[in-house]
């Protein structure tokens, strides 16, 4: 076992050095802000006991996510990464936050719960699919140990058709690119070879649309992402069901993607994971999976008192006087249900909690609908609109003094 761990450390060191040698400044994804991640968890009945959350970024890179999250919680923030230069940058950008931020340059294999403590929210983004399988298993076990009950983790991964399309090209590139050359030179050589391949495909005249789209996507990636997705021999597409199976033994279960998939109302985590994989193999994609440490994730419900509902839709009545709600794109939602119309009219003006919406809508339909019917219709509509990305649920706990005003 000692020999195996030594070998894994050598691979990890090589991965870290590649980040040190190729400049990398990742984009921050706004959907990963705690209010949206914890809002998704609340939809499945996962509740936080406190507004103050402690956050761990396992693979923090240059600290962009830590810096962003710092303004959203007064809790403890810990970031770990293999890359020394990335950790130095992360420490620089968070130095004004004082001792509540702790950035560590350390191997996953050297971390444990006693060292780190426990957290309410863990990010494991851009990491799980570029490390050896044994290290990934160790990282997932560490995540499960470090999550508090009710804690949530975001894990990003590639799944579906695009990684499969590129598998042959990835193998060919690794075979023809000299791995002893500096990482930057390897990337340049590989990009040139891919450009040649794309040119050949365009001249061939066959139906190569999916492959050409995948190659164009690669051309837009920064050098570090390109290196690890094409030349790193540890790169592995992952399945949602595989992650669920590995984490579920520790009581951590798949909820949904941060951009919800069409499986949100399934009650069992493994059922959601299996459908997620089926969807991925139909269209492929880079996923942000949200998992929570809970006994069992409940069926999705909009009724949590900790959720503030909002929408970007605005009302535009069409030529026939019918209510149409648009978000600025060409796609608009035509509404025929008067309760749904009232719901969207309210949300398009300002955010509401479920109990407030229920009271307002019930008042509009007094004498025509029972409050229990309004409750059922609102819950169904909000969940349906959320699953289509037309409304959003922001985690914003009710202040303790008024927490008893939530719905039954």
Q: What residue ranges belong to the model's regions?
A:
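Conserved SAM-binding strand-loop segment of SAM-dependent methyltransferases
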Residues: 98-110
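A short glycine-rich, Lys/Arg-flanked "PGG" loop and its adjoining helix->strand segment in the class I
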Residues: 137-149
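Conserved class I S-adenosyl-L-methionine
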Residues: 154-181, 189, 193, 197-203
């Amino acid at each position: 076992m000692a020999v195996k761990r030594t070998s894994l450390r050598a691979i990890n060191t090589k991965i870290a050095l590649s980040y040190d040698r190729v400049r990398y400044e990742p984009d921050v994804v706004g959907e990963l802000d705690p209010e949206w991640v914890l809002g998704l968890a609340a939809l499945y009945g996962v509740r936080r006991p406190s507004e103050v959350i402690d956050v761990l970024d396992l693979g923090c890179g240059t600290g962009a996510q830590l810096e962003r999250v710092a303004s959203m919680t007064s809790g403890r923030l810990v970031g770990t990464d293999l890359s020394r230069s990335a950790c130095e940058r992360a420490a620089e950008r968070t130095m004004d936050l004082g001792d509540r931020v702790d950035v560590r340059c350390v191997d996953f294999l050297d971390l444990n719960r006693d060292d780190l403590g426990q957290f309410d929210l863990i990010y494991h983004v851009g990491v799980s699919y570029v490390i050896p399988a044994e290290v990934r298993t160790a990282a997932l076990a560490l995540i499960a140990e470090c999550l508090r009950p009710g804690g949530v983790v975001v894990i990003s991964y590639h799944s579906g058709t695009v990684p499969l399309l590129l598998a042959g090209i990835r193998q060919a590139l690794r075979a023809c690119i000299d791995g002893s050359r500096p990482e930057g030179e390897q990337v340049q050589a590989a990009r040139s070879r891919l450009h040649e391949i794309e040119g050949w495909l365009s001249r061939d005249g066959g139906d190569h649309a999916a492959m050409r789209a995948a190659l164009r996507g690669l051309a837009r990636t920064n050098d570090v992402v390109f290196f690890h997705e094409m030349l790193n021999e540890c790169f592995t597409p992952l399945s949602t069901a595989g992650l669920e199976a590995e984490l579920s033994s520790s009581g951590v279960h798949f909820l949904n993607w941060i951009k919800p998939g069409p499986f949100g109302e399934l009650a069992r985590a493994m059922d959601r994971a299996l459908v997620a994989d089926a969807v991925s193999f139909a269209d492929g994609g880079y996923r942000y999976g949200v998992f929570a440490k809970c006994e069992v994730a409940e069926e999705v419900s909009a009724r949590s008192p900790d959720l503030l509902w909002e929408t970007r839709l605005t009302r535009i009545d069409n030529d026939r006087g019918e209510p149409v709600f648009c978000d600025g794109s060409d796609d608009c939602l035509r509404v025929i249900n008067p309760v749904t119309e009232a719901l969207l009219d309210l949300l398009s003006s300002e955010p509401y909690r479920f109990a407030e919406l229920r009271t307002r809508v019930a008042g509009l339909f007094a004498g025509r609908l029972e409050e229990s019917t309004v409750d059922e219709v609102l819950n169904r509509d909000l969940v349906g609109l959320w699953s289509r990305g037309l409304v959003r649920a922001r985690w914003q706990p009710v202040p303790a003094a008024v927490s008893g005003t939530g719905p039954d």
